[in-house]
Amino acid sequence: MSEKELMKVVGFYEGLSIDDPKSFIDEKEQIPVPSSRDLLVKVNAVSVNPVDTKLRQDNGIRNALRILGFDGVGKVVAVGDEVQKFSVGDRVFYAGTTTRAGSNQEYQLVDERIVALAPKNLSDEEAAALPLTSLTAYELLFEKFG
């Protein structure tokens, strides 16, 4: 995969009403190259998370496209030089972060520390619905209630 290859992304520049035709924009961007502890994941499925809807409510206009998508499932297609837990070909799922482009794109860089192998008994679509909600439930059950 060369650095000059393009991928499809879906994002927004301005938090418009969802029924506005410009509320989401299809664009093309370069496929990123992983470094350090990053995985490059070919995204197979995503879910809509409450975090996505909250981030969309930002009414400011920005110069850069904002790509949402907090939860995702896909196949690892490249790894950074410090990655230890995953290999090319692994099917993974993850909850993203608000500091990076989200999963509403064909390929996504994800830090291996927020990734897990996707459950084999779930479809991509089913697994995509789990990451952040599972973490929230875990925190409630084991960190709050002990």
Task: Describe every region a protein language model picked out.
Residues 1-8:
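Eukaryotic N-terminal low-complexity, Ser/Thr- and Lys/Arg-rich leader segments
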Residues 12-17, 46-48:
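Short polar catalytic/cofactor-binding loops
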Residues 19-30, 59:
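Short glycine/threonine/proline-enriched tight-turn/helix- or strand-capping micro-motif at secondary-structure
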Residues 27, 90, 105-106:
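Extracytoplasmic/periplasmic beta-strand context in beta-sandwich domains
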Residues 30-47, 57-99, 114, 122:
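Glycine-rich beta-strand-centered segment in the early N-terminal region that forms part
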Residues 95-146:
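NAD(P)H dinucleotide-binding glycine-rich loop of Rossmann-like/cofactor-binding domains
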